[in-house]
Amino acid sequence: MNRRQIEQSVTEELASADDRLVAAYLFGSVARGTDSSNSDIDVGILLRTAPSGELNDLRFELDGHLERALGRRTQVVILNNAPPDLLHRVLRDGRLLVERDRAARIRFEVRARNEYFDLLPILKRYRRREAARA
């Protein structure tokens, strides 16, 4: 499957997903076009607020559903509680596939970008220290 086919399949599979799904992004090597036959398919999902256990149950459910439908390993990540650096990579390199609530998606993206840029000076200092140790 090429990227376009994967995008279409993921979009179709998530079209009937749980009502709590707000948005979904394809990210990682498939979205960048650098995947190989061994690469998994990374899908980030933004969900309406729900208890943590319910979110994980839904993640496992969607992960299994996508793996069966695509015939390839998938990794579904709940974006609601993902770290800022991962959210930055999803928004920078990812492709929005599903959007059920535009306003909620935009609020999420603005918040995620603000958190990342607030954290960026700390990340840069940390990376410089790690590079100096190597």
What do the predicted segments below correspond to?
Residues D42-I45:
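Short, aliphatic-rich beta-strand segments
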